[in-house]
Amino acid sequence: MKVRSAGGDGDALCVTEEDLAGDDEDMPTFPCTQKGRPGPRCSRCQKNLSLHTSVRILYLFLALLLVAVAVLASLVFRKVDSLSEDISLTQSIYDKKLVLMQKNLQGLDPKALNNCSFCHEAGQLGPEIRKLQEELEGIQKLLLAQEVQLDQTLQAQEVLSTTSRQISQEMGSCSFSIHQVNQSLGLFLAQVRGWQATTAGLDLSLKDLTQECYDVKAAVHQINFTVGQTSEWIHGIQRKTDEETLTLQKIVTDWQNYTRLFSGLRTTSTKTGEAVKNIQATLGASSQRISQNSESMHDLVLQVMGLQLQLDNISSFLDDHEENMHDLQYHTHYAQNRTVERFESLEGRMASHEIEIGTIFTNINATDNHVHSMLKYLDDVRLSCTLGFHTHAEELYYLNKSVSIMLGTTDLLRERFSLLSARLDLNVRNLSMIVEEMKAVDTQHGEILRNVTILRGAPGPPGPRGFKGDMGVKGPVGGRGPKGDPGSLGPLGPQGPQGQPGEAGPVGERGPVGPRGFPGLKGSKGSFGTGGPRGQPGPKGDIGPPGPEGPPGSPGPSGPQGKPGIAGKTGSPGQRGAMGPKGEPGIQGPPGLPGPPGPPGSQSFY
């Protein structure tokens, strides 16, 4: 199928069946449905209705134009028929009058000889000549009225020619509108291809989004795995710290026991200070034991200090680890919020993209159906316009032919009128010559009657007819009289038979491009179509710029109560207080063991 202009030149070729078939293969068809039934108020139906109404208006306009042309043609034919009948009637009347005048003039001589009333008849010739002049003036008035009617017919012919030109211009505008429709179809096809490209880009972006979702899920899974490992590591560290706290508590209890022992030893040493001299051997052993115990206590103190340093290091490490855990929890919570927000935004974008794709598919389907219907309808309109154009061309050809025939008949009528005027001039000159001759004869008769006696004899027989005199010299042409009043219109004559159709004339030149028409009304929005199938994921896109810093979050709930901390270091011994009052003497203890023998004393030499 090819869409051409109405002019028949074939220059406005725009859309072919192959292109439409290719477009049908590329574009999926989605019916304009609404819950399983066709939509009652789709844009395609409204556009079809508006197009039908516009075409009906165009047909009505063409029908009115044809009726007007037919009425004008009938009026022209009636006027021409009435003119021809009036001219034929006037011609026949004047022919009859001229024949009668010739007969009367031929019968003047015998009447003048036979009857004496010839003078009276000669006296009546003056008013008859005046009547003839009046009739000639009436003929001139009729001819002037006929000229006016001829001018009116020429004006009607000009009106018909202008209407034919307007029809040709309208046909040119129709061809131009068809060309514009072809251009708009090309633009629609380009838009459809652009929509296909955008759908392909959207499919690629959806693929990228799904790939990013998979990557985010993998990252979240990895973060959860690392969080589990760190939690297990923290539990192990907590177990070790618990064990170390237990050992430290044991060491502290041992240290407290030792301090109690030392305090008891001090009390015993004070109590046994008086008996030191007696138990020197036990004191040496006890001093050795005390030195050993002090060394062991010094070692224990050093071990306790090392353990305290280790515990300080462990506590600082635990604090750092706890801070790292808090940071990691904060980052994980922030990442989870960001992922949730991104997933929500992605879901919103996906929903909006699905809605847009659905609307795009519905629009593509509607435009496809509308374009197909427009092409079919434009093809029908083109055929009807070409048929109407051919019929109009034939009618205009017949009308031009009839106008040319009418012009030929008017030329013939003018020639016949000129011949009639020449004949009338010749007859008037002959009449003037006859009148002059009759005046001369009248003068002769008057002289004869003067010389004749009163007695009157019987009239003699009529004499023979005289010879016709020579033609006189042609007189000067008289001035044109004033324009007479237009005569009344005669009765309409019967319509003549229709002539044979003539040969088809050559194809006329293409008219100028008409003005651009007014833009049509905007159609209503179509209903949403069914969603299309899900596309393949596209390639991964570039990393976007970091978003703006969000507002500070709301304070979180208070955490659970922590475990009791490790006991702090033992403080330095305070200042020695004032000595208290002397206590009561205690119970005398049992006698001690006998001490070892003392060293031998030195011998004095007094």
Swiss-Prot record:
Its source organism is Homo sapiens (Human)
- Membrane topology (Extracellular): 78-606
| All residue ranges annotated as the Collagen-like domain in the record | 455-513, 544-603
Write out the biased-composition intervals (Gly residues).
526-535
What is this protein's name?
Scavenger receptor class A member 3
Recorded superkingdom:
Eukaryota
Q: How does it sit in the membrane?
A: Single-pass type II membrane protein
Tell me where in or outside the cell this protein is found. Answer: Endoplasmic reticulum membrane; Golgi apparatus membrane
**Single annotated GO MF:** scavenger receptor activity
Q: Where is the composition biased (Low complexity)?
A: 485-519
Q: Where is the composition biased (Pro residues)?
A: 545-558, 591-600
